[in-house]
Design a protein with these regions (language model features):
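Ser/Thr/Pro-rich, acidic low-complexity intrinsically disordered regulatory segments
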Residues: 19, 106-125
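Extended boundary segments
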Residues: 1-17
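Compact, glycine-rich, soluble single-domain proteins
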Residues: 12-89, 93-94, 98-106
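Residue-level signal for threonine
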Residues: 7, 24-26, 113
Length: 125
């Protein structure tokens, strides 16, 4: 599954070939936040269940990123330490936050697909 899945909190998830899942925020979310000036990344090798794992600070607000599914964090995007603006410049690629190994891959597939996410945005419009 290389296509993106989405949460109602405007996070995107992409299942990678190695079974890990990459997480970032959607263009809709980064646009609402404005210019991101700081990203606090999660701890590696930490198993997380439904908890805050990252914090974003922007010129408009601070926002938490919660672990979208249960799993172990295996990688963080260290480039965001020096260049948090990557979240705004390229939220679907270079602006990713972390990767994790999910406890249950089926939970990834059960998240919103692109059409369902588009409907969510339209409803929040």
């Amino acid at each position: 599954m290389s296509e993106l899945r989405f949460t109602v909190e405007h996070e995107w998830l992409r299942l990678e070939a190695d079974g890990s899942v990459t997480v970032g925020i959607t263009p809709f979310a980064q646009n609402a936040l404005g210019d991101v000036v700081f990203v606090q990344l999660p701890e590696l090798a930490r198993h997380v269940r439904d908890a805050e794992v990252s914090v974003l600070e922007s010129v408009k607000a601070a926002s938490s990123i919660n672990m979208p599914l249960d799993g172990e964090i295996v990688e963080v995007n260290a480039a965001l330490d020096a260049a948090p603006e990557l979240v705004n410049q390229d939220p679907l690629a270079q602006g990713w936050f972390f990767r994790f190994i999910p406890d249950d891959l089926e939970q990834v597939r059960a998240l919103l697909d692109q059409p369902a996410y588009d409907n969510l945005i339209a409803a929040q419009g």
